[in-house]
Amino acid sequence: MNKIKPEIKDNIAETLFIPLLSRAHESHRKDAILKDPMACELVEKIDYDFAKFGKITMSTTGTAIRLRHFDRLVQRFIDRKVTEDPVVVSIGCGLDSRFQRVSNHNQATFYELDLPEVINLREKLFPASAKDLTIKGSMLETDWMDMLRQKHPHGRFLF
């Protein structure tokens, strides 16, 4: 398998590998709180020295609990059907695979927002989907919010 070499230069952006590794480790546990096959696949696809993070067992459990909680919130948001246009926006998405984990994902539009170098890597790793879109930018800018409002004038948003 040809591995993908990340071109992440920013130290903050590089932290995206920690929760990815946590999700992959958790998924391999027999009594896993969160199963994330996509995380396992991504760790195998990326040419990166994950060993530099050492043992991350303490943060693995916390990450799994937090992600399972947010996955359930997203699932309920979509299931409530309070709008014909539910929109889920993941700010600072990194390499999170919530779209793949949430079973009713095709009933909503997902947007993954992160720094350009992170989104560039994400677009190489994740399968393209008309329901899981990316936004290159900073959460501190507001132009992406205006774009979402234009695209989804009757949308109900979950950030």
Indicate residue ranges for each PLM-predicted region.
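Rossmann-like AdoMet
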Residues: M1-V89, C93-G137, T142-D143, M147-P153
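Short SAM/SAH-binding signature in class I
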Residues: P153-F159
